[in-house]
Regions:
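Short C-terminal domain-edge/linker segments immediately following a structured domain
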Residues: 80-85, 98-101, 138-142
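Short, solvent-exposed loop/turn segments in extracellular or other extracytoplasmic domains
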Residues: 62, 85-91
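Beta-strand-rich recognition domains
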Residues: 1-67, 77, 111-167
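Short, surface-exposed tryptophan/glycine-enriched loops
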Residues: 89-108, 112-115
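Solvent-exposed serine/threonine-rich low-complexity stretches and specific carbohydrate-binding patches
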Residues: 66, 73-85
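Surface-exposed coil/turn segments at beta-strand junctions on protein surfaces, enriched
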Residues: 43, 50, 87, 100-102
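Generic detection of short hydrophobic beta-strand segments and adjacent strand-loop junctions
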Residues: 35-39, 79-81, 90-96
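Short, charged/polar low-complexity linear motifs in solvent-exposed/disordered segments
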Residues: 69, 94-97, 126
Length: 167
């Protein structure tokens, strides 16, 4: 069966809808946080776009501080800001290679922060980054052909990877 002829659906979800109740706050020299994004067994990601809204501490040294964005341990982008942008909400849009997606996915954020060229306190209060839970992920999902096989039940009627509300 021609996969391109099968239905394509757009799915967009905020981090809040994915279970991140409040902004993801990363503290310290090196800290990280993540959010789960699952893809149904009978769907294939054809395209993906991350709209990331975040704020980095205004006290950071911009040449030594950054935010890494990873999907399933694949580096998507390292976000570096100028001194003028620090402390202000920022937004970046990242196109994600759909080949990085599997059934169960982990979108991870690693914060590397430095506030001085001297000896630093790893837990200093000026070392923080905040990833907004209003950030969002948009996926174009292609329906995959399914074979008639009772061994697949309860799929396609129930799929634990499906993060849509039950109807």
């Amino acid at each position: 069966e021609n996969v391109a002829a099968l239905p394509l659906r757009q799915w967009k979800s905020s981090f809040k809808s994915l279970g991140l109740r409040s902004p993801l706050t990363l503290r310290g020299l090196e800290s990280e946080g993540s959010i789960g994004v699952d893809v149904r067994r009978d769907e294939l990601v054809e395209s993906a776009r991350l709209h990331l809204t975040f704020t980095l501490s205004p006290s950071l040294l911009p040449t030594l501080s950054h935010l890494k964005v990873l999907l399933n341990d694949e580096l998507l982008q390292t976000v570096v800001l100028s001194k003028e942008q620090l402390g202000k909400p920022q937004a970046v849009d990242l196109d994600i290679d759909p080949r990085y997606f599997t059934d169960y996915n982990r979108l991870r954020f690693q914060f590397i922060g430095h506030y001085t060229m001297e000896c630093e306190t790893p837990t200093h209060s000026s070392l923080w980054a905040s990833v907004s839970n209003e950030s969002s992920l948009t996926l174009a999902l292609r329906q995959l052909p399914q074979r008639d096989d009772l061994a697949l039940l309860p799929a396609p009627f129930f799929d634990p990877r499906d993060n849509r509300p039950v109807r």
